[in-house]
Amino acid sequence: MWARVFSSIAEKRPSIDLELFYDDLPNSDFNQLFRSVHGLTNFKSYLQEFPSVLTFASANSFHTQVLPEASLDFGFSALASHYLTKPPCNISNHIHMVGAEGDERANFQEQGKLDWERFLGSRALELKRNGTLCVVNPGIDKDGHHLGNVGGVHLWNIFNDIWKKFVNDGVITETEYRSTNFPQHYRTVAECIEPVTDPKNAVFRSGLRLEHVETRIVRCPKARAFTEHRDVDRFVNEYVPSLRSWIEPTMLKGISLNRPSNERNSIIDKLFEQFTEHVKIKPDGHGFDYCDVYMICRRAYLPKAAARLNA
């Protein structure tokens, strides 16, 4: 993707130097990032074709300001800012906010609103006048579809059912079940665009304006491939590890630290063994399909006194 961006810029401004800033949390593997950027892995790097691109990194939360004010021409974030600064509460009946109800669902919506405004407000401060922000996030479309639930199996309900069964079977405690919460909020389109369309909102007053918004469903490539090769074992071996890589940390965090490490890991192994059996029994309908909200915003002007939402 970035190679296409740089190629387009080079056609118009062949002699310009470009600065590319990566941002992630301090505990992220920046060493692996720059090994990839500098072509020290098996993947081709854009630097091999565009040596005038200068790369930098920032180890800060994107819920705060990362770059100097009015210094950014183009900002891009994908599949990231649905994560919250913290879970606002435990969910009594589910592991994810899509299954939360009543006050608990409202708490996640409110935390999602606050963190979204912090994210957009920080980017608004960084953008130059007429600078552009492109954000792609898991969301909820007009039909109620969301990541993990776009017409096949409901991925979050399956993991929740297994986790709840573990309580009934004495594998985990009720406290551990309630302590397992993904710090995420899937926003509707209305929730996504409110800060950049409401004249009373501080983000809107900072000059950030909505240019375009749409939702798209992106089908799981592993599930698509399975419809052709029909090899269940191959599908399981490709599909389950891709989920485990990012689901496991949150599930593990819910298990009491008073348990020995090997016991905690054994519970996680059992969770994914049962999930794997579910996939083997009924592979059709499984797949990690995305339902994403695509937003493009522009900073229309630079106010004399921009509000700092991350203060």
Tell where the protein language model's regions lie, with residue ranges.
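Conserved SAM-binding loop of SAM-dependent methyltransferases across substrates and taxa
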Residues: 1-14
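A mobile, often basic/glycine-rich helix-loop segment
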Residues: 77-110
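Core SAM-dependent methyltransferase catalytic element
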Residues: 199, 288-311
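Helix-to-beta-strand junctions that scaffold the AdoMet/dcAdoMet cofactor pocket
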Residues: 89, 127-129
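Conserved SAM-binding motif I beta-strand of class I
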Residues: 17-25
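Substrate-binding/catalytic lobe of Class I Rossmann-like enzymes that use SAM or dcSAM, i.e.
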Residues: 129-263
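Conserved beta-strand signature within the Rossmann-like core of class I S-adenosyl-L-methionine
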Residues: 74, 100-106, 130-138
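S-adenosyl-L-methionine
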Residues: 31-65
